[in-house]
Amino acid sequence: MRETPSSHPGEASVDGVIDQLLFLAHFFGRRADAVQLLADTPITGGRISEAHIFECAQRGGLSLSRAKKGVADFKASELPALVFAPEGGDPLILLRRDGDSFECVQAGIRGSVKLELSALTADYAGVAYFVRPLVFFDTRSLLYHL
């Protein structure tokens, strides 16, 4: 049975997740490395849980928010997004949308590829997260401008 966007991904491949989080951190201009992202994250059998994916993303200066709609309804302004296959393999980054196709970044050295919407919805029907940079606001700086 396929997972819906509102279901939990459970676990995913730690190598694929970290590769994609590193790419996204660099995409948003943040310096990050695998050691920094993993820090004290428990890894069992090469898998990482959903809660730990959120922690690793925060260490890389990223904010993940779960998509409440399917990939077909994603707008170009909502990208990038991190999508998972139901079996929890390597996630895929949806970088840009062009009509019914997406420019996608694959984990590892496989690079980017253009995928049609039909292929995406068939292969990556698991959960999806919209990715944004974390914004740090220092309230002390506000005092200097008053």
Feature-to-residue mapping (PLM):
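Noncatalytic regulatory segments and standalone regulatory/sensor domains
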Residues: 1-2, 18, 41-48, 54, ...
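Cysteine-nucleophile protease catalytic domains, especially the papain-like/related folds used
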Residues: 1-66
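Membrane-cytosol interface segments
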Residues: 65-69, 102
